[in-house]
Amino acid sequence: QALDDIISRCEIDILSAPFDDPTDDARHYQIGSYTDCWGSTWVNHQAGIIGEVKEYPFADFNKVWNYESPKKLFLSGISGFEKTKAFIDTHKDKFILGGWISLFERMQYLRGTENLFMDTLIESPEYFKLMEIVEDFYNTYLDEWLKLEVDGIIFGDDWGSQRSLLISPETWRKQYKPLYKRFFDKVHTAGKFVFMHSDGYILELYDDLIEIGVDAIN
């Protein structure tokens, strides 16, 4: 109660801008099964959470070569940013965060978590093609957000378990650090800040994240 009292006396300074994203399926939070626009089939047994992916479009990795991401679907919904712009205009006294970019987690949804962990060690051409597909989509996604008067962009990937990273620090630095840096550089070039969320124990990555430009981490 004491904490609630303190919070009630303080104004919220940071807000997340809304966006009616056509690639973000509302069925995420409903009980049942469905296939999203990426081709991942979700199963949810409890309303209010997003469930789990049970069927992956790249369970057969050969399919990666003829895959088309939902980039066109995303671009078809750019008009949804009108509500975003109106929100920004009415909250100019606040720090506004935009977007939500999940690179590693999207790769898991497409390939399967266990498969992806093995892929980081095998380093097949299909694995790097998967990474390329995800990077290409989110580059387009980021470009549209950077056209708006937001103050920062959010990146969210859970990299830790309770005790350690999900993959070795060396593998992360080799494969994912350059990937994130390309995105973070683009955000900073646009004069905006990089916010990053990751659950789990990620202490071993802090120096790397600072080096490549994370401004705030949760």
Regions found by a protein language model. Give the residues of each.
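Active-site loop segments of alpha/beta catalytic cores
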Residues: 1-2, 35, 44, 62, ...
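Short acidic, Pro/Gly- and aromatic-enriched capping/linker segments at domain boundaries
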Residues: 16-33
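Catalytic domains of carbohydrate-active enzymes, especially glycoside hydrolases
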Residues: 2-19, 144-150
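Long, mid-chain structured domain cores
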Residues: 45-46, 50-57
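Active-site-proximal helix-loop elements at catalytic-domain edges
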Residues: 7, 55-64
